[in-house]
Design a protein with these regions (language model features):
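Surface-exposed, active-site-proximal loop segments in enzymatic domains
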Residues: 36-40, 72-88, 118-127
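Active-site mouth loops of central-metabolism enzymes
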Residues: 1-10, 77-92, 128-136
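Short, acidic/polar
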Residues: 7-20, 86-102, 138, 142-143, ...
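Structural preference for beta-strand elements that scaffold enzyme active sites
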Residues: 25-26, 63-69, 101, 106-111, ...
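Beta/alpha (TIM)-barrel catalytic core signal, keyed to glycine-rich beta->alpha loops juxtaposed to Asp/Glu
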Residues: 10, 115-200
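Active-site-proximal loop/turn and secondary-structure-junction residues that shape catalytic pockets
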Residues: 2, 31-33, 70-74, 111-116, ...
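N-terminal binding-site loop/beta-alpha segment at the start of enzyme catalytic domains
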Residues: 1-69, 89, 105, 144, ...
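Active-site groove signature of glycoside hydrolases
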Residues: 99-125
Length: 200
C-alpha cells in the first residue's frame, strides 16, 4: 500500500525479498496504490512489485499468489480511469494495466476494491446520497470476469469492502448461471470492527 509513496523501489524490493525468504507467498496490492495517491503516483505499488517480479524471474513468480484490485466509483479518483465503474471497458482496461504494471501474464486473485453501488463503508454511517441511476449488474460483472478467466488473464475473483447482501448476490448469480464464484472477501474485521456480522 505504501510502495511508491513512503517506500522507494529499492526499499520495496528489499522488503519483498525479506518476506519471501521467510515464507510469505501472498502479495496483495491494488491499482490505486500507494495510499495517499494522486494522478502522478497511482499504480506505483504494482509497478514496484512488477519490477521485482521481473528481477526474480518467471520460475519464482509461479510460487507467488498475487492479488490486486480494481477501484470502484465515488472516491474522487477519476484520474485512474473514466468512467470509474465495473463496465466491460473499465474492467478490461484495469486488468490490462495491472498485468502490464505487475509484469506478469496472469493475476491469481482479482478483487473489486469496493462496490459500485453506494453503501455504508470505510466507517461511514448513514448514506447521504443514493444513486438512483445505478442498475443491479452482478450478472454482467461476473460474465465479464468469466471471459477474462477463460482468456487466462485472471485465475480467481473476489470482493473487498462488500456487505453480506453483495456477497449473496454474487454467489446467487454465479450458481444460477454457472459463472465464476467469488473465492475471497477482504473486509475490515476485528474485535473493534464487527460491522460485517450485522448482515449475517
Amino acid at each position: 500500500m505504501t510502495f511508491g509513496n513512503q517506500n522507494t523501489e529499492i526499499e520495496a524490493h528489499n522488503q519483498l525479498d525479506y518476506a519471501v525468504e521467510r515464507g510469505i507467498n501472498f502479495l496483495d496490492t491494488a491499482e490505486m496504490y500507494p495510499i495517499g495517491g494522486n494522478a502522478q503516483i497511482f499504480g506505483s505499488t504494482e509497478r514496484f512489485i512488477g519490477s521485482w517480479i521481473n528481477k526474480i524471474g518467471a520460475s519464482q513468480r509461479e510460487k507467488l499468489v498475487i492479488a490486486t484490485k480494481i477501484a470502484g466509483p465515488n472516491r474522487g479518483m477519476e484520474y485512474i480511469r473514466k468512467p470509474l465503474d465495473f463496465s466491460k471497458k473499465s474492467i478490461t482496461e484495469a486488468v490490462e494495466l495491472s498485468l502490464k504494471n505487475l509484469q506478469t501474464d496472469y493475476i491469481d486473485l482479482y478483487q473489486m476494491h469496493w462496490p459500485e453501488r453506494v453503501m455504508n463503508m470505510f466507517g461511514q454511517r448513514g448514506v447521504s446520497k443514493i444513486d438512483t441511476n445505478w442498475q443491479e449488474n452482478f450478472f454482467e460483472v461476473l460474465t465479464i470476469f468469466d471471459g477474462l478467466i477463460k482468456e487466462g488473464k485472471i485465475k480467481h475473483i473476489g470482493v473487498s469492502n462488500e456487505n453480506p447482501y453483495g456477497v449473496m448476490k454474487f454467489i446467487n448469480e454465479s450458481e444460477k448461471h454457472n459463472l465464476p464464484r467469488i473465492v475471497s472477501i477482504q473486509n475490515p474485521y476485528s474485535l473493534l470492527n464487527r460491522l460485517f456480522e450485522v448482515g449475517l
